[in-house]
Amino acid sequence: LRRYEAAKETALRQLDELYEKARKEAGEDSAAVFDVYAMILEGAQFDASIRSAIESQNVNAEYAVAVAGDDLAKMFEAMDDEYFRARSADIRDLSERLISILQGDSVKSAPGVGAVILAAKDLTPSETVQMDKSRLLGFITEFGSSNSHTAILARTMNVPALMGIPVDEHLEGRIAIID
C-alpha cells in the first residue's frame, strides 16, 4: 500500500508539471485534461478499488492499478456518448503512468533524428505534451478520434494530426506528408 501511495504522489507531481507545460504550449483549456487526471487519481472510486485489491486480495500495486484502470476504462467504453467513450483512453493513460512509476520506469523520448512525422498505434495526452515540438512536424495514429484529448491538444498546439489512419510499420524512415 505504501508503494501505491508513493506512486500516487509522484503521479500527482508529474501531472502538475504536465499541466504547466500544456498550459504554456496549448492554453488553460487544453491543459485542463491533466486536472481531470488528478481528479480521477484522487477520486474515491479509482483509489478505493486499488486500495481494496491491495488490502483484501493481497495483490501487488501494479496489478491492482491495472485491474482498477481496466474496469473504469471499460465502464467509459460502454457509454453511448462518443465523448465519454474517448475518456477511456485517458483512464488507460493514467493507469499506465502509475504502473510505470511503480516499476521505476522513466519517461522515454524519441532519439535525436531531426524533424519527424510520428506514426503510432496511439498517443496519450501525456505523450503529446512531452514531445519536442521543435522536431515534430505532425503525427498519425491508428487509434483515437477527433474527440480525444490528444486531438484537442494537437489542435491547440498547432501540430498537424490525423487519427484513425492505419499505420504501416514499414514506413519508418520514409518521406511522408500529412494532408
Regions found by a protein language model. Give the residues of each.
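Non-catalytic, soluble scaffold/interaction modules
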Residues: L1-D179
